[in-house]
Amino acid sequence: MNWTVKYLPEAVEDLRGLDGAQRVLVRKAIGKLAQNPLPETEGGYGKWLGNRNRAKLAGFLKVKLRGAGLRIVYRLIRQEEQVLLIVIGVREDSEVYEEAQKRIERHGL
């Protein structure tokens, strides 16, 4: 079963801003997410995020692309079988998570 993947407008821009090799890796990861976006504790690919420093991300998940140093932060909407991509970016300190927090607040998620 494939889940529907939706993007915040800013996440689309994140994807466009990556170089070609990074974009390929991210698209591959998004394809896996579409197949099984559940948390690892339920046999999926995502890891739960929590509340750290200024980022209040409890209830959201992430996927790490370790080799590329990229992170995808998303929200799982089970009742609609949807994945909402919040941010796609390089993890520099906690910058990607702080940006996710800003977008969550801006979009009222």
Where are these regions (language model features)?
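A short, surface-exposed loop/turn module that caps and links secondary-structure elements
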Residues: 32-64
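Arg/Lys-rich, positively charged N-terminal/basic patches that mediate binding to nucleic acids
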Residues: 1-31, 105, 109
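A structure-centric signal for secondary-structure junctions around beta-strands
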Residues: 2, 27, 57, 80-82
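Enriched for short, Lys/Arg-rich terminal
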Residues: 13, 64-109
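Residue-level marker for the onset of beta-strands and adjacent loop->beta junctions
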Residues: 1, 59, 70-72
